[in-house]
Amino acid sequence: RVLLAPLVAALLFQPRASARLVAGVVYLVAAVSDLIDCEIARRRGEITNFVKLVDPIADKLLLAATLIPFWIVTESDPQLGGLPIFGGIPLWTLLVFFGREILVTVLRTRAARSGTVVPAMPIGKYKAAAQSVFSGSMIAWLALRTAAAEKDWSGGTYQAWESFHGWFTTITLILALILTV
């Protein structure tokens, strides 16, 4: 995931729908590989203190690789945002997400220095899952909006899908924010 995060970010900065669609596929591979890695490690009893410390950092890098480019791209072209309620991603949501992640990372690092490993709590895992679903949905949203602009989509089917997907993405953002605080 650490290696895939910069690729996701670079692809999201590309102005073509195809690049943003590939970003979504790469993101999906990274997210699914995280689930598979964790499950395999759990089954084999190979969850080390190092993994407990590094895994959340990889999650944060992947989150940053999606949220920051999405915010920058939609700020530079507001038509690509268009989420219900929010438009794009408000800057304050990034501050909430990253503020919490920085605080938790600092606290975990301090605990690790004193020999204590603080594993993720169940609520933290739900938060990470909500953020992951939101990030994936947001990448798909950006690819969809970019494709619509490139291909001049405007029909009823597109509008229905855009409305559904926009609300789904907005609801997952709200859920991720609630679980973050």
Task: Give the residues covered by each predicted segment.
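A feature for the membrane-embedded catalytic helix bundles of lipid/isoprenoid biosynthetic enzymes
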Residues: V2-A5, A9, A17, V22-L28, ...
